């Protein structure tokens, strides 16, 4: 059986390296090529040699070539690169998975990609997406509780709050049956909560490998907490590969991890 060929955009990034290693260990998928910035010193080199894993794919700086040699493409980059990838996916009629965060709330994926399957999630961890469902259900049952979301990420994390924290907030808002609106409260009581339909955020940055999220339901007599801690970026790589393999068999459309999970 031929292996599914997976192209990786941002193959030498923090997440990209984990993706290369995860896919290279798969029995049903292989890395077709890895994309780096134009003019990079790594263009033409063997990806496995650079990263240190069993991967024979070459590194390229041509987005078009990457799509040409791939059955499906995965990207963890930045919003601008993500848009270019969506345009190329549409042109080449190839499915694409994106885990890029920091995108505008106003972005409409259908403006760029219409005729191929596309899956986006701010967090591709299977367990985090289970937590999102638990949060929505808990919020629905805990009417009258204040909702606060806390996160800590490595010092290099650019978006704040993280895409995952926003997903948690939106899950809570669905449970409240209200329009999502983000409120960030300043520590020390300088800003007061207006009602228990609002969602507070607290953000911390530090270290190099941290990724913790906690959602707190604070009532008058008790406090309930849900938390998720990613101890290794492989959890996102595993989710991304699972999503990519699933996406290949889907009709054109915009998908989330929730869509995939209901079919498992």
Curated annotation (Swiss-Prot):
Keywords from the named record: Amino-acid biosynthesis, Cytoplasm, Diaminopimelate biosynthesis, Lysine biosynthesis, NAD, NADP, Oxidoreductase
Residues noted as binding NADP(+) in the record, renumbered to the chain: 37
Pathway: Amino-acid biosynthesis; L-lysine biosynthesis via DAP pathway; (S)-tetrahydrodipicolinate from L-aspartate: step 4/4
NCBIfam families: dapB
Cross-referenced PROSITE patterns: DAPB
Protein name: 4-hydroxy-tetrahydrodipicolinate reductase
GO terms under biological process: diaminopimelate biosynthetic process; lysine biosynthetic process via diaminopimelate
Organism of provenance: Ehrlichia ruminantium (strain Gardel)
EC number: 1.17.1.8
Residues the entry annotates as binding (S)-2,3,4,5-tetrahydrodipicolinate: 154, 163-164
Residues binding NAD(+), per UniProt: 10-15, 99-101, 121-124
Acetylation among keywords: no
Role description: Catalyzes the conversion of 4-hydroxy-tetrahydrodipicolinate (HTPA) to tetrahydrodipicolinate.
Cited CDD domains: DHDPR_N
Family: Belongs to the DapB family.
Subcellular location: Cytoplasm
Matches recorded under Pfam families: DapB_C, DapB_N
Catalytic residue positions: 153, 157
One GO MF term: NADP binding
Enzymatic reactions: (S)-2,3,4,5-tetrahydrodipicolinate + NAD(+) + H2O = (2S,4S)-4-hydroxy-2,3,4,5-tetrahydrodipicolinate + NADH + H(+); (S)-2,3,4,5-tetrahydrodipicolinate + NADP(+) + H2O = (2S,4S)-4-hydroxy-2,3,4,5-tetrahydrodipicolinate + NADPH + H(+)
GO cellular component, one term: cytoplasm
InterPro entries: DapB_C, DapB_N, DapB_N_CS, DHDPR_bac, NAD(P)-bd_dom_sf
């Amino acid at each position: 059986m031929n292996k599914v060929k997976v192209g990786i955009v941002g193959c030498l990034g923090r997440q990209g390296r984990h993706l290369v290693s995860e896919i290279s260990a798969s029995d049903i998928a292989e890395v077709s090529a890895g994309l780096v910035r134009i003019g990079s010193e790594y263009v033409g080199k063997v990806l496995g040699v650079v990263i240190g894993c069993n991967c024979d794919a070459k590194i390229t700086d041509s987005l078009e070539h990457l799509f040409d040699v791939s059955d499906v493409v995965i990207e963890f980059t930045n919003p601008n690169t993500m848009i270019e990838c969506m345009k190329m996916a549409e042109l080449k009629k190839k499915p694409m998975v994106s885990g890029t965060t920091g995108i505008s709330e106003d972005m409409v994926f259908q403006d760029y990609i219409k005729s191929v399957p596309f899956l986006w999630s701010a967090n591709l961890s299977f367990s985090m997406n289970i937590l999102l469902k638990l949060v929505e259900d808990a919020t629905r049952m805990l009417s009258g509780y204040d909702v606060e979301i806390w996160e800590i990420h490595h010092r290099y994390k650019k978006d704040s709050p993280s895409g995952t924290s926003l997903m948690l907030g939106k899950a809570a808002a669905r449970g409240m049956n209200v329009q999502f609106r983000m409120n960030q409260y300043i520590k020390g009581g300088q800003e007061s909560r207006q009602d228990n339909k609002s969602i507070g955020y607290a953000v911390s940055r530090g270290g190099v490998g941290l990724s913790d999220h906690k959602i707190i339901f604070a009532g008058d007599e008790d406090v309930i907490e849900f938390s998720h801690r990613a101890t290794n970026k492989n959890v996102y790589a595993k989710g991304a590969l699972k999503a990519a393999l699933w996406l290949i068999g889907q009709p054109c459309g915009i998908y989330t991890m929730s869509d995939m999970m209901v079919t498992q």
